[in-house]
Amino acid sequence: MLKRDMNIADYDADLWQAMEQEKVRQEEHIELIASENYTSPRVMQAQGSQLTNKYAEGYPGKRYYGGCEHVDIVEQLAIERAKELFGADYANVQPHSGSQANFAVYTALLQPGDTILGMNLAHGGHLTHGSPVNLSGKLYNVIPYGIDETGKIDYNELAELAKEHQPKMIVGGFSAYSGICDWEKMREIADSIGAYLFVDMAHVAGLVAADVYPNPVPHAHIVTTTTHKTLAGPRGGLILAKGGDEDLYKKLNSGVFPGSQGGPLMHVIAGKAVAFKEAMEPEFKTYQQQVAKNAKAMVEVFLARGYNVVSGGTHNHLFLLDLVDKNLTGKEADAALGRANITVNKNSVPNDPKSPFVTSGIRIGSPAVTRRGFKEAEVRELAGWISDILDNITDEGVSERVKKQVLDICARFPVYA
């Protein structure tokens, strides 16, 4: 018989120890991975609820199982809040992840062998935008576009490639691009050849919700996003659209279920509903504004310390440090910073001479540290510590000094107070 006082600690000590150690790691390390964030206890409460028990294949009011009257309310709340938050008139909250959302879009609108244009992974794109190692790159004929010598998207190249290859879809969005995307220009290019414009705004969804970054929803045929990252919700995906094309919406729904998924995760959808409500609060906008300010403040320090920032700056929450001139690899930098309790990720840079497993750069993002309460003063100090380590990458004394500074600032700015 199940009892409400059952717990992991008394039953599975090994698992509980790992979970508790991860809790300590998150509190005692500075998180700078651009795709990571801290979700609220309210979201975690939803994810740990009895909703995890319920199968609900189908959509609200059109389920294949009985007993869905309450989860219908949960999902409809998430749908309506997502539409309001992003100015959409269609939302599908069922995708289990951003990658699943993207695959559902492809499933709904493309046939194997169709041509798509996607941002080159080495220039800041994402695996699911046509990388040859991803299913998207195996199923479709992918033509990559990239950035110019200034580090910005080359729209002239994009237009020329579109005209030459006549793709059925142009994919916008990125995983490591610090500039502003001209969604209107991309739609013009797509319209000129009769292609879909599909935008993956996973990295900037929180900034978009707070009007800190341009919203692609009014311009794209379809928009997807994750619900974590800058949006700070549970790990999951979301599909949005606007324009009233009911035929398109039906195709998208079918692309999710039954096209690429079975039963939705109702406990996660409840977490999404909570996160969307939180994103409508005034303090969320203040938070996102600070995310952008903090990223810019860090860039200023790195430039002053002689580091090469790809694109020369940032207009969102992330940026890349190109370490080629420093004769460092991303792998070395990642490991050295990790020893000082600073977590980043190695990342390829444009024209990277190293393999994706080594790389010549690191990606830095500000959402998580901003969630802790860091402002410009703290992130400038942090950027200085990172520079100290990278300037003296084999000096254990510098590493130990910075680690103590990190532990001190983490204690002053806890994740969960």
From Swiss-Prot:
Cofactor(s) annotated in UniProt: pyridoxal 5'-phosphate
Annotated binding of (6S)-5,6,7,8-tetrahydrofolate, by residue: L121, G125, H126, L127, S355, P356, F357
Record carries keyword Transferase: yes
Entry's Gene Ontology BP terms: glycine biosynthetic process from serine; tetrahydrofolate interconversion
GO molecular function, one term: glycine hydroxymethyltransferase activity
Subcellular locations according to the entry: Cytoplasm
Function: Catalyzes the reversible interconversion of serine and glycine with tetrahydrofolate (THF) serving as the one-carbon carrier. This reaction serves as the major source of one-carbon groups required for the biosynthesis of purines, thymidylate, methionine, and other important biomolecules. Also exhibits THF-independent aldolase activity toward beta-hydroxyamino acids, producing glycine and aldehydes, via a retro-aldol mechanism.
Protein name, entry field: Serine hydroxymethyltransferase
Species of the source: Erwinia tasmaniensis (strain DSM 17950 / CFBP 7177 / CIP 109463 / NCPPB 4357 / Et1/99)
